[in-house]
UniProtKB/Swiss-Prot annotation:
Assembly description: Interacts with ABCB9; this interaction strongly stabilizes ABCB9 and protects ABCB9 against lysosomal degradation. Interacts with FURIN. Interacts with TMEM175; inhibiting the proton channel activity of TMEM175.
Organism: Rattus norvegicus (Rat)
Cited CDD domains: TM_EGFR-like
Ranges in the topological domain labelled Lumenal: 22-371
Post-translational modification: O- and N-glycosylated; some of the N-glycans attached to LAMP-1 are polylactosaminoglycans.
Topology term for the membrane: Single-pass type I membrane protein
InterPro entries reported in the protein's UniProt record: Lamp2-like_luminal, Lamp2-like_TM, LAMP_CS, Lysosome-assoc_membr_glycop
Residues spanning the membrane: 372-395
UniProt-recorded name of the protein: Lysosome-associated membrane glycoprotein 1
Gene this chain is encoded by: Lamp1
Length: 407
């Protein structure tokens, strides 16, 4: 989904270097030549891909040559299809937006991106070849008969891809063949209160979460074994326009389910007010598994937008060799988006290959290794002190015996 703010320091660095070019204009018209979708925006695409035994990041912007792909775009047919804007560019690249509406609002319900790993200009030395398609929901929405307007960056996180739109003007279900004068501005563009920026409320932190145990089984046996305590750190705007950060614990009593696949293992944990989905992927080349995706759908009754949703499918956390288990006693913070951080405590997890429903050999996190340095250093210092005292004692004893020698 769309979420303001960067996911990782690497993304911040790359995004800072983007040249914000002038936005392009795209139109979809019906059979009578009347526009039903208009969109003007600039865009960039950051894609993580495997190149041998390393991961690389490709960075491209929407070129001026991008154009509407007419045979994949439509105004939608009543009760049959959704209005769709498809934009093609480069050698096999496609950005597609599908729209939906209710009685008061319309939205970009889904965004799809197809990229070409055979394009050596942007994906040199890519391990895989050919096209790949990823998708995500978005937070792009506006009132009916109003134009959606967002000057600020809009980030949409997909599997291995982050799409950034800026200087965006979008409208579907047009009442005329032009943008409406009235606008719905995105939350990122909203001005700060004239009384000065409010101090964020201190995090409302509950007690540390309890450890929960999860076991996901498929046709071929157990594909996920996990023991961990999870906590959600969510930042959102309340109805009184103040920003708060709250912590919500995932409880052992929450129900869970999951799926087993050859390349993807999922775990869903939830209750009546929230569903958290964790996706574990696998790099077949390096034989590593890792947490690659997090999606959260939750209800926040005191928020301006009570329905909270965010996701990120470009993560690489909780990583270990397939057949082994990842273990970390230290608290870990996984930044999913600007609005969500996932705190993980006392974790041990193993995905894809689990034998006899037991954890395999342990691969410890770096944090636990660093924590061991302190007791080792203290132990070394104490051993050195004992050695010095022992040497001093032996020297003193030797001198004492020398004073009683027979003349």
């Amino acid at each position: 989904m769309a979420a303001p703010g960067a996911r990782r320091p690497l993304l911040l660095l790359l995004l800072a270097g983007l040249a914000h070019s002038a936005p392009a204009l795209f139109e979809v018209k019906d059979n009578n030549g009347t526009a039903c979708i208009m969109a003007s925006f600039s865009a960039s695409f950051l894609t993580t891909y495997d190149a041998g035994h390393v991961s690389k990041v490709s960075n491209m912007t929407l070129p001026a040559s991008a154009e509407v792909l007419k045979n994949s775009s439509s105004c939608g047919e009543k009760n049959a299809s959704e209005p769709t804007l498809a934009i093609t560019f480069g050698e096999g690249y496609l950005l597609k937006l599908t729209f939906t509406k209710n009685t008061t609002r319309y939205s970009v319900q889904h965004m799809y991106f197809t990229y070409n790993l055979s394009d050596t200009q942007f994906f040199p030395n890519a391990s895989s070849k050919g096209p790949d398609t990823v998708d995500s929901t978005t937070d792009i929405k506006a009132d009916i008969n109003k134009t959606y307007r967002c000057v600020s960056d809009i980030r949409v996180y997909m599997k291995n891809v982050t799409i950034v739109l800026w200087d965006a003007t979008i409208q579907a279900y047009l009442p005329s063949s032009n943008f409406s004068k009235e606008e719905t501005r995105c939350p990122q563009d909203q001005p700060s209160p004239t009384t000065g920026p409010p101090s964020p409320s201190p995090p409302l932190v509950p007690t540390n979460p309890s450890v929960s145990k999860y076991n996901v089984t498929g046709d071929n046996g157990t594909c996920l074994l996990a023991s961990m305590a999870l906590q959600l750190n969510i930042t959102y705007m309340k109805k009184d326009n103040t920003t708060v950060t709250r912590a919500f614990n995932i409880n052992p009593s929450d129900k869970y389910s999951g799926t087993c696949g050859a390349q993807l293992v999922t775990l869903k944990v939830g209750n009546k007010s929230r569903v958290l989905e964790l996706q574990f992927g696998m790099n077949a080349t390096s034989s590593l598994f890792f947490l690659q995706g997090v999606q959260l759908n939750m209800t926040l009754p005191d928020a301006i937008e009570p329905t909270f949703s965010t996701s990120n499918y470009s993560l690489k956390a909780l990583q270990a060799s397939v057949g082994n288990s990842y273990k970390c006693n230290s608290e870990e913070h996984i930044f999913v988006s600007k609005a969500l951080a996932l705190n993980v405590f006392s974790v041990q997890v193993q995905a894809f290959r689990v034998e006899s429903d037991r954890f395999g050999s342990v691969e410890e996190c770096v944090q636990d290794g660093n924590n061991m340095l302190i007791p080792i250093a203290v132990g070394g210092a104490l051993a050195g002190l004992v050695l010095i005292v022992l040497i001093a004692y032996l020297i003193g004893r030797k001198r004492s015996h020398a004073g009683y020698q027979t003349i």
